[in-house]
């Protein structure tokens, strides 16, 4: 990915991440995300292999997926940074987001599980990006 395009993608992602994190009401409580959430839950309820997915599982999956791009962007913009340092960034970003919700957004629900799921998503993103970089390097 060329750097200007990567910067644009990063900016778009950060807008989504910040908006999702500091929206005053639960992001799935109203609007398009509530419709998507309801439709996904209806779909999982009608699909025998997915009927175990309830709201809490869907929220956890969403938290993981939300932070996967962060891990990817960390590797794109800081490829030589040690993995442990990279992995700490999603944890710190999530702690900042969840802490802000606790302090300033009384209608939001911040939990340790959110931090864990967000961190997991970041680590998955780091793993994906590092794996792709390794494959590209080995193919040359």
Pin down the residues of each PLM region.
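Bulky hydrophobic segments
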Residues: 1-108, 112, 126-140
